[in-house]
Swiss-Prot record:
HAMAP family documented for this protein: PlsY
Protein name: Glycerol-3-phosphate acyltransferase
UniProt subcellular location: Cell inner membrane
Transmembrane intervals: 14-34, 63-83, 92-112, 128-148, 154-174
Pathway: Lipid metabolism; phospholipid metabolism
Primary residence: membrane
Molecular function via GO: acyl-phosphate glycerol-3-phosphate acyltransferase activity
Species: Bordetella pertussis (strain Tohama I / ATCC BAA-589 / NCTC 13251)
Amino acid sequence: MPATMVLTAPSLLSSSALIVLAYLIGSIPFAVVVSKLMGLQDPRSYGSGNPGATNVLRTGNKTAAALTLLGDAAKGWFALWLARALVPELSWGAYALVALAVFLGHLYPLFLRFKGGKGVATALGVLMAIEPWLAVATIATWLIVAVFSRYSSLAALVAAFFAPVYYVFGSGAAWHARLEVGLAIAVISALLFYRHRANIARLLKGTESRIGKKK
């Protein structure tokens, strides 16, 4: 069997450690941390109750919302960057699991009793680490839908739908797609839809709040 196919105990341990570390990084609740540092209400106590940038924006504090967005995106990127920095020979399968772990950490954070955000910014950070141009295409999709609809949730859903599509069809032209990574992106997209199920119901009813509107 080729050496690259052998999973040694040290490699399994390092991969497992990176996955756990990624989950813990994803668990950092930037919406709560930023709000507390800036003297704002806990984002879980108003609006949608979601500890994310869109809900923080409902306070009217754009700086706090921007810092939350950057923090949530940065942790998605950082977890994958750190994994490669610590273990350069990390397999693509383990890399994909690290991507899922940091995303799940945001959705179900240890530090907030497993009640986290919806994961849009963290997902974008993950995409930025995987392929910067993939992230740019996904962000552009979000911006176009958000500008014309003023619905953050609708923009997130459309962007989530197209992210794995972009990854597959961009392969060969802009990057080399990996099956394991593609599956991770697809799972992240599916989880984004699941986390937005209440938003989907409100969009269908016409009761969803628009960007910047206080509830």
